[in-house]
């Protein structure tokens, strides 16, 4: 059954799809009698409220779609991973559009998932096929893209039992504003503390493993004398740079062969073509307070 809102995180953002529809309507209404107005650019900002809800069975398709955007063509069973996320619904949230008044023109699906957050304990779920495939993929990329020290530390974490590692998943569509991440992460930390108190696997994590969608600008064909191309790593979810700064193991691998040039949501770059990457990070859980403070400073308006 559909879940009810257990807490609310209201934010404002622009929905590109809605803006496109508004633009089309404006052009149709202007008619042929006013061709000049019909050619004018329509730049309408759409106000959207979002709410955080407890994860439920109804969210399967939405969560799976977001996981597919993260993992692309790698051999991770996103259906099985989605099932795990739904089964442990005592931790994590999904983002939906706030309840729309009956007299509103908005015909969107009230159960549409715009994003989600969750934590899956990898150490406690050893032998689960989709998670083993995920760990194999990370270790393979680590061998190719990380340092020998990074490889050794990653192997010890993912293949050993001495320290518990949780997979932190925080995904949303690009048109959802980053400010919504702050209350979601704060709520997740509270839920993990409660899971620890009640001896649930999600509360036993000593390290946090993240896979972030990142991009680097495509290098220009010609560079002026003395001008060096900056190898800048851009995070699709802006706030995840706070985790990157505190990571003790981190590396990036290119997914250009698996995806088109990614849109970062940083429109000030004039939609400059980007080379898509995935950035893997390991963060000690005792650094979460520092991360949350940095995130608060960055996202608080």
UniProtKB/Swiss-Prot annotation:
One of its GO terms (biological process) is DNA repair. This is Protein BCCIP homolog. One of its GO terms (cellular component) is centriole. Keywords: Cell cycle, Cytoplasm, Cytoskeleton, DNA damage, DNA repair, Nucleus. Pfam families: BCCIP. Residues 18-43 have a biased composition (Acidic residues). During interphase, required for microtubule organizing and anchoring activities. During mitosis, required for the organization and stabilization of the spindle pole. May promote cell cycle arrest and DNA repair. It is found in: Nucleus; Cytoplasm, Cytoskeleton, Microtubule organizing center, Centrosome, Centriole; Cytoplasm, Cytoskeleton, Spindle pole. Residues 1-43 are annotated as: Disordered. It comes from the Eukaryota.
């Amino acid at each position: 059954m559909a879940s009810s809102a257990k807490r609310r995180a209201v934010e404002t953002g622009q929905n590109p799809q809605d803006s496109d529809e508004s633009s089309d309507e404006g052009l149709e209404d202007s008619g042929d009698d006013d061709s000049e107005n019909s050619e004018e650019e329509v730049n309408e900002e759409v106000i959207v409220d979002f709410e955080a809800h407890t994860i439920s069975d109804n969210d399967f398709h939405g969560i799976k779609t977001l996981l597919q955007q993260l993992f692309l063509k790698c051999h991770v069973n996103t259906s099985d991973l989605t099932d795990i996320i739904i089964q442990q619904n005592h931790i994590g949230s999904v983002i939906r559009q706030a309840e729309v008044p009956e007299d509103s023109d908005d015909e969107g699906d009230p159960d549409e998932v715009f994003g989600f957050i969750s934590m899956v304990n990898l150490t406690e779920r050893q032998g689960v096929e989709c998670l083993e495939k995920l760990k194999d993929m990370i270790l393979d990329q680590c061998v190719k893209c990380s340092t020998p020290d990074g490889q050794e530390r990653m192997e010890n974490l993912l293949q050993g039992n001495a320290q518990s590692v949780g997979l932190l998943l925080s995904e949303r569509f690009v048109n959802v504003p980053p400010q919504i991440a702050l209350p979601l992460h704060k709520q997740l930390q509270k839920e993990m503390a409660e899971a620890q108190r009640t001896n649930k696997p999600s509360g036993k994590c000593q390290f946090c493993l993240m896979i972030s969608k990142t991009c680097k600008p495509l290098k220009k064909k010609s560079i002026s004398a003395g001008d060096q191309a900056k190898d800048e790593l851009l995070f699709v979810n802006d706030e995840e740079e706070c985790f990157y700064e505190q990571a003790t193991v981190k590396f990036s691998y290119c997914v250009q062969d698996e995806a088109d040039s990614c849109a970062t949501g940083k429109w000030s770059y004039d939609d400059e073509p980007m080379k898509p990457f995935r950035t893997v990070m390991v963060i000690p859980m005792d650094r979460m307070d520092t991360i949350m403070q940095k995130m608060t400073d960055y996202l608080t308006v």
